[in-house]
């Protein structure tokens, strides 16, 4: 078994003006257990960043902290800063509902609402009291087009979202997330429940979406990280170990642990 120097780090940084989001000394605790250990990390605007690492390394916990999803866990405590447009979204006075309009989330398994395709997209607007039908129609069409789903469902908008295939449901969830025009889209293993064809379609959708959005994705699929992302971060036991351009991580990693992990020789 290879012995690694876990004190080694290689983490790139970016100029402030091209940052979409950053964390400073971010810790996450579940009770007494420290799941994330003081991570400083920056995300570049309109790029796809993949978070990789063994099961239990903290990558999903880290992702969920970026828009306060860990708030729903009673024993979770998050300290440090999460900076979006100069504002610490981890501060106690932040309106979490409003913040999540800027930092959206797509979950591991498709979770459409028990409503029509149309009402899945308009849900947030109708909840806010918006009744302008033309406005809502335009939002539905634009969002579904951006999620590469419009052509498949444009004649069935008032059918139940549950009539869609798994891949279509996941793209509907993406459309629902981008309908409120977020700046950042968080994706927690969005292809894990999809077949290979639906996965490829999802990756193509992500590539188109990065023209308008910053995407941060957790994946266990090394091929997906290599294909779909611009930057990749390797996590291990709650620490950020290496963070660089995806080509560098997969072809010329600075650290042996990273190189072994992405090539399947880790351990």
UniProtKB/Swiss-Prot annotation:
Any one GO biological process = phosphate ion transmembrane transport
Give the residues the record marks as binding ATP: 53-60
**In this protein, which residues make up the domain named ABC transporter?**
21-262
**First and last residue of the signal peptide:** none
Q: Which keywords has UniProt assigned to this entry? A: ATP-binding, Cell membrane, Membrane, Nucleotide-binding, Phosphate transport, Translocase, Transport
Q: From the Swiss-Prot or TrEMBL record, what is one GO molecular function term?
A: ATP hydrolysis activity
**Pfam families (alphabetical):** ABC_tran (PF00005)
Which cell locations does it reside in?
Answer: Cell membrane
Q: What are the annotated GO cellular component locations?
A: plasma membrane
Per the record, membrane topology reads: Peripheral membrane protein
The EC number(s) this enzyme carries: 7.3.2.1
Q: Which family does it belong to?
A: Belongs to the ABC transporter superfamily. Phosphate importer (TC 3.A.1.7) family.
Its assembly, as annotated, is: The complex is composed of two ATP-binding proteins (PstB), two transmembrane proteins (PstC and PstA) and a solute-binding protein (PstS).
Q: Which NCBIfam families match?
A: 3a0107s01c2
Entry-linked PANTHER family? ABC TRANSPORTER I FAMILY MEMBER 17, PHOSPHATE IMPORT ATP-BINDING PROTEIN PSTB 2
Record's function text: Part of the ABC transporter complex PstSACB involved in phosphate import. Responsible for energy coupling to the transport system.
- What's the name of the protein? Phosphate import ATP-binding protein PstB 2
Organism source for this protein? Streptococcus mutans serotype c (strain ATCC 700610 / UA159)
Q: What phylogenetic lineage does the species belong to?
A: Bacteria, Bacillati, Bacillota, Bacilli, Lactobacillales
Gene for this chain: pstB2
